[in-house]
């Protein structure tokens, strides 16, 4: 659970309070944004000591081995107002690797 305490003027960096770990975290899309936020006095919400270390990026693979794929997508024009249509190769569906998409409204056909 995160709460936003402060945001840099350009919106690139934020100070988040992480209640699960009782920590304030400087978040930025890139390392430079975090460094600039650290040096910008208008960015700080209070005078606190900061432990500055290397950026931490958490990578998690939740589906086990083989869940990531190299995908090729082909786009083709359709008649105006006809909506959208997704098609996939039948052998993949038969193996059950992505069967959770097939029976949902607007799902794969």
Curated annotation (Swiss-Prot):
Signal peptide bounds? none
Cellular localization per UniProt: Plastid, Chloroplast
InterPro entries on file: Ribosomal_Su5_D2-typ_SF, Ribsml_uS5_D2-typ_fold_subgr
- Keyword annotations: Chloroplast, Elongation factor, GTP-binding, Nucleotide-binding, Plastid, Protein biosynthesis
Please give one Gene Ontology molecular function term for this protein: GTP binding
- Source domain of life: Eukaryota
Keyword Translocase tagged: no
Where is it predominantly found?
Answer: plastid
- Which Cys pairs are S-S linked? none
One GO CC term, this protein: chloroplast
Pathway this chain belongs to: Protein biosynthesis; polypeptide chain elongation
Has keyword ATP-binding?
A: no
State its role. Answer: Chloroplast-localized elongation factor EF-G involved in protein synthesis in plastids. Catalyzes the GTP-dependent ribosomal translocation step during translation elongation. During this step, the ribosome changes from the pre-translocational (PRE) to the post-translocational (POST) state as the newly formed A-site-bound peptidyl-tRNA and P-site-bound deacylated tRNA move to the P and E sites, respectively. Catalyzes the coordinated movement of the two tRNA molecules, the mRNA and conformational changes in the ribosome.
Q: Which family does it belong to?
A: Belongs to the GTP-binding elongation factor family. EF-G/EF-2 subfamily.
| Protein name, UniProt field | Elongation factor G, chloroplastic
What is the scientific name of the source organism?
Answer: Arachis hypogaea
């Amino acid at each position: 659970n995160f709460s936003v305490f402060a945001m840099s003027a350009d919106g690139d960096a934020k100070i988040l309070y992480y209640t699960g770990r009782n920590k304030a975290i400087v978040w930025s899309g890139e390392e430079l944004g975090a460094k600039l936020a650290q040096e910008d006095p208008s960015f700080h919400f209070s005078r606190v000591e900061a432990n500055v270390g290397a950026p931490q990026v958490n990578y998690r693979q939740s589906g086990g081995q083989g869940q990531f794929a190299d995908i090729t997508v082909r786009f083709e024009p359709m008649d105006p107002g006809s909506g959208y249509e997704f098609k996939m190769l039948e052998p993949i569906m038969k193996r059950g690797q992505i069967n959770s998409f097939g029976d949902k409204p607007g799902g794969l056909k």
